[in-house]
């Protein structure tokens, strides 16, 4: 399978760097090829066009993240522990790869409707993890019965996503991972003074 070949991943990793540095619209396939250390034509053995590279990049990176997350949350007992893990892993992934953070938080957002639909399809695995955590939490009594799981999932993902976007927009000047517990507590306890 060509996706597992080393050159495929070289191109994916090079695309992350080039797109982060130049922006998606200013990133030519030739720049990606040069960064990857391959001939321009080699790119087309793996990808149809630049848009395909962007989608594949997101699918590859998010797919790996989702697979690891599905395994890691099995080791956690409660919904709160699982949610804490999702938040910290999400923040750690992007804090550890500044270029990937720029691509996922800024460049993917500037794409056309068709591209956004493909990205949303890839995100379904992540959202399913959140749905599972919420559903298990309701069943165990940890989360209140009658919770609108879909709305809660959107709010959780939106909070995580916006926290990362703000960090990227602020030139990554502070410790994103250090915000994990604060974000968790806000999501779990809300703003109500009990």
From Swiss-Prot:
The organism's place on the tree of life at top rank: Bacteria
Primary localization class, coarse: cytoplasm
Location relative to the cell: Cytoplasm
Keyword Cell wall biogenesis/degradation annotated: no
Gene Ontology annotations of biological process type: fatty acid metabolic process; lipid catabolic process; regulation of DNA-templated transcription
UniProt KW keywords: Cytoplasm, DNA-binding, Fatty acid metabolism, Lipid degradation, Lipid metabolism, Repressor, Transcription, Transcription regulation
Gene Ontology MF terms: DNA-binding transcription factor activity; transcription cis-regulatory region binding
PROSITE patterns with a match to the protein in the record: HTH_TETR_2
Pfam families, per database record: TetR_C_4, TetR_N
Keyword Zinc: no
InterPro entries (UniProt xref): Homeodomain-like_sf, HTH-type_Tx_Regulator, HTH_TetR, Tet_transcr_reg_TetR-rel_C_sf, Tscrpt_reg_YsiA_C
Gene Ontology CC terms, in alphabetical order: cytoplasm
DNA-binding region ranges: 28-47
Domain HTH tetR-type: 5-65
Biological role stated in the UniProt entry: Transcriptional regulator in fatty acid degradation. Represses transcription of genes required for fatty acid transport and beta-oxidation, including acdA, fadA, fadB, fadE, fadF, fadG, fadH, fadM, fadN, lcfA and lcfB. Binding of FadR to DNA is specifically inhibited by long chain fatty acyl-CoA compounds of 14-20 carbon atoms in length.
Subunit structure: Homodimer. Binds to DNA.
Record-given protein name: Fatty acid metabolism regulator protein
């Amino acid at each position: 399978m060509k996706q597992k070949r080393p050159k495929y991943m070289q191109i994916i990793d090079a695309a992350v760097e080039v797109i982060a540095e130049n922006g998606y619209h200013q990133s030519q396939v030739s720049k990606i090829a040069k960064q990857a250390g391959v001939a321009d034509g080699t790119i087309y053995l793996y990808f149809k066009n630049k848009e395909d590279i962007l989608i594949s990049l997101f699918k590859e990176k998010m797919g790996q993240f989702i697979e690891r997350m599905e395994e890691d949350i099995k080791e956690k007992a409660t919904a709160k522990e699982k949610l804490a893990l999702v938040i910290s892993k999400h923040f750690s992934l992007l804090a550890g790869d500044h270029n990937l953070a720029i691509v996922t938080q800024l460049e993917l957002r500037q794409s056309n409707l068709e591209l956004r639909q493909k990205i949303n399809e890839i995100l379904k695995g992540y959202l399913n993890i959140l749905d599972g955590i919420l559903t298990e939490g309701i069943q165990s009594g940890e989360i209140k019965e009658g919770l609108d799981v879909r709305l809660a999932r959107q709010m959780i993902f939106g909070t995580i996503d916006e926290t990362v976007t703000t960090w990227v927009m602020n030139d990554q000047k502070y410790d994103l991972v250090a915000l994990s517990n604060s974000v968790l507590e806000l999501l779990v306890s809300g703003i109500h003074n009990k």
